[in-house]
């Protein structure tokens, strides 16, 4: 399905799910049996048998966040090369702002799962017992990766007006090189943190060979029903 359709469906479903979960916490509703569900991870090609309504609450938030990232990637892909002339570029600016906003929202949703929901979730006997979407390091990696994508896209958008300028001196309105360096370093640090946390969530050594980590991360493609557009954005 299209990512936007999934975003809309989850947006409609989450309020009911959260209302039911709140009623369970307040004991205004009692379940005769525990909730059981089978989940196919969006990050690894495995199925997991889970129980408890909190599992579904966490996973629906993660599905929402991943779909937001997928929709952002779809928008960027549809724009193609947007280092264009001033007239043509204006038509792309609004779409780029939407994509950046979606990435920031995805990062915030993942951060909410990591800081507000997972601390109350039962600790796994091993990291392989739960999908990466229910492991704190994996969720934090998704949050930082989405934020890094947003930063990288915003930097590219910032530099688009000057893409056709060659040679010194810089145009009068060009962003400060020192500011750009700080932004790039911060973005790179977010990507590095995401890779390290992602490796930890998969039981890998964060300082293992770079090509092994890159190969493993490349294998974490989203489910085919999202069109494979949830991976790194093209910069």
Where are these regions (language model features)?
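Extended alpha-helical scaffold/coiled-coil
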Residues: 1-235
